[in-house]
């Protein structure tokens, strides 16, 4: 079973190398090609939170230089799915801060949901949140996908 990480910070690499000596480090996420990675059932990732956190300047998911790395992970998943004819990864898990729900008045979280839904069905549009605010838990289910979130 392949186990890999994308990290550029030397200390973080040292920690994972110490705790997971067989982990392969793929380097900068912007330079990874998903079609060249061995297929995996589960892909987990996070993106820097500074641009969507209430503690930061809230530049947003699209305008922020750090949090926009989310879209690099989505690109890698798209490339993996294309290379495996939609089979892998079977599951993707994304982690970030609760501020993502309110960043850009909820539009950033909707963009996250839309990116995930579009991996399987790009004809589906994620609706606006109920009453203008995202719930702390929810789901979107389609014919070829299911998506859930929880704080």
Region roles according to the model:
Residues 32-42, 52-151:
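Class I S-adenosyl-L-methionine
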Residues 4, 25, 43, 92-93:
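Residue-level marker for buried hydrophobic side chains located in beta-strands
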Residues 1-32:
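SAM cofactor-binding core of SAM-dependent methyltransferases
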Residues 47-48:
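Short glycine-/small-residue-rich Rossmann-like dinucleotide-binding loops
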């Amino acid at each position: 079973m392949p186990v890999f990480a994308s990290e550029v910070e030397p200390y973080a690499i040292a920690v994972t190398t110490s705790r997971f000596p067989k982990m392969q480090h793929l380097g900068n996420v912007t330079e990874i090609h998903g079609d060249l990675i061995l297929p995996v059932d589960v892909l987990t990732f996070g993106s820097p939170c500074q641009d969507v956190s209430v503690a930061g300047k809230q530049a947003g998911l699209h305008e922020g230089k750090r949090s926009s790395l989310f879209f690099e992970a989505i690109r890698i998943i798209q490339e993996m799915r294309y290379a495996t004819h939609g089979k892998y990864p079977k599951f993707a898990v994304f982690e970030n801060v609760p501020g993502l729900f309110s960043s850009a008045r909820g539009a950033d979280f909707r963009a996250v949901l839309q990116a995930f839904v579009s991996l399987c069905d790009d004809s589906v549009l994620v609706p606006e949140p109920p009453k203008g605010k995202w719930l702390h838990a929810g789901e979107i289910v389609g014919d070829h996908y299911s998506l859930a979130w929880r704080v």
